[in-house]
Amino acid sequence: PTMLADAVAAAQRTGAQLVIYNYRLVTEDGVQNACLPMKDETLDIDQMGLANYFYRYWMPYVHGQEAWCRLYRRDIIEQNHLRYAPNDEIFAEDTLFSAMYLMHVHTLAALAIPYVNYLQRGDSLMGMIKPNLCRRLITLSVRLTDYVKACGRDKELADVLPVLCYDKLICKGIRLDPSLEDV
């Protein structure tokens, strides 16, 4: 019940453009503890470097990649015309949105408390066959690369971007569709 108030307070206290909070996975086996190995902290992304953030927090899934466990600033979304990509074109459109939003973050606040219960059912989208998964993940990689260039951050992220794309396509894609039926 305090998720929004706590996230807004963290944003105001730290000046963060993004607040990330933890969640619990709920399956038919019950409710798990906090999913993400995060801690309460404030990160100066400008000082740390965005590439370093991706390596230390994004890819090892310390802060997750989901768009729904974050508090965003509307002005950043509107000024940069950020929108979700159509799901038939992109798989993990929330991941793409979150990565694009990070191009505009200078300060990030993380809250370790799991505020959200993420219900994962066997018949949910994540449990179903994902048509054209590889094509949709490749499209995600291309769109992220294009957006990074449009933001003028391509040199800064030159070494991390191929790893991000590989991680999403190969590691996550094969895990989600080990048969590779759509390749």
Language-model regions, residue ranges each:
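C-terminal subregions of glycosyltransferases and related glycan-biosynthesis enzymes
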Residues: 110, 117-183
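Donor-binding/catalytic cores of nucleotide-activated saccharide
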Residues: 2-112, 116-132
